[in-house]
Amino acid sequence: MADYVEMWKNIGMDVDMHDTLCQVLPTAVGDVFLSQENRPKAMDFWDLVISEVHGIRPAELIEEQKKGRKVFGTFCVYVPDEVVIAANGIVTGLCSGSQFWVPAGEAVLPKSTCPLVKASVGARLSRTCPFFRIADMYVGETTCDGKKKAYEILGEDVPMYVMDVPQMKRAEDIARWKDEIAAFAKKVEEVTGNRITVEKLKEAIHLINEKRKAIQRVYDCRKSECLPISGRDVLLMIQIAFFDDPARCTQMCNRLADELEERIRNGVSVVPKGTKRILVTGSPMSIPNWKLHQIIETSGAAVVCEEMCTGTRYFENLVDEGGKTLEEQFMALSERYMKTNCACFTPNKGRIDDLLRMVKEYKVDGVIDTSLKFCCLYDTEKYVVSRALKEAGVPVLSLETDYADTDAEQLRTRIGAFVEMLHA
């Protein structure tokens, strides 16, 4: 591993506390990923990135800032990357997936806040996440009450911009989201000092569409009865996609897809024939939250799809590239992003439709619907999700968890029993 200590000091990180966080990462990566047999060779790229997750990309971002580019840290798949890229800005994800950050978050937030929100705030306040230290602006959105209030804390020492996501999907809501995107574009122009033109936005839309297509290719390979890659490896790929340079992400995902397609042609599977196929749905899973996938795939099943923000919601549906004016392009962006079926919407029948479609496409034997503890939206929506799946004859297991390992054995027992039931 390269030595990034000087870089971390220069951006004001608490290096000693950060060392404590980093000490557990090699063991976790080894247990979850490197211990797997017969992995695709293309996963070497993601293994390298995760081994230096707080070094490689942060160093690149700092070098780009020296050239005058601005970095925007985002929390949600509803923030349109295309707008930032069109102004020569850079988008990065932010830290939010480790129990390590939760105590620092609980120092200022209620304990009854979801772990993702507590970890986000804790990562920033503890000065142990380089992405929070580097970002010139944070961009939030109104998809969650916990995040909305957390943004007020996060915005105390770094500029914070919040996009107002409509809570319904009527024609007027899509038009209103288009106006929100246009307003965001003005703010991005102000921060970067660069004007967004039709041509620049067209290039950015195409760039992100190509990234979506590449990730879709990887997911399409998981529809095969011959399963060429584990769910854990795909989860890692998509988690890193939130941070990586989009052109490089596209290249690497296409390289992985090429290998997976070759594996399918040659009958190379990572699981024995007859392994039960699981779709995981619910709350997002940020780095390094691999707990559920690890338990499922070491309990005799395989994860073949994730209907979540760190899954299909991130890449399904392309933006229409035919817009001739900024107004048309903003509407095309609005129409695409409003197809993302987040639990913040009411009604949210689109998510049910997506799940029923994916069960067929990915040849799913059972669904695991998971919510983070105190995530009211996904916890409440479990009722209609479970009912719809059961009516369609699809076995479903509903779970609630957090980032701690204290419930790991309980989860293993319940998931193991669910997998046994699928074999009955």
Which residues are covered by each model-predicted region?
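A charged, amphipathic alpha-helical module
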Residues: 2-70, 182, 186-315, 348
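Peripheral docking tails and interdomain loops at the edges
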Residues: 2-9, 383-424
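An N-terminal, globular interaction/scaffold subdomain
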Residues: 54, 62, 69-125
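Redox- and metal-dependent alpha/beta enzyme cores, enriched for Fe-S-associated oxidoreductases
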Residues: 66, 78, 83-96, 104-105, ...
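Short, acidic/turn-prone active-site loops that include or flank metal/cofactor-
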Residues: 95-101, 164-169, 307-311, 402-403
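Acidic/His-rich segments in extracytoplasmic proteins that coordinate ligands and/or metal ions
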Residues: 122-187
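A short, acidic, amphipathic alpha-helical segment used as a generic capping/interface helix at domain edges
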Residues: 124, 346-363, 380-381
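Acidic beta-strand-to-loop metal/phosphate-binding motif
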Residues: 134-142, 364-373
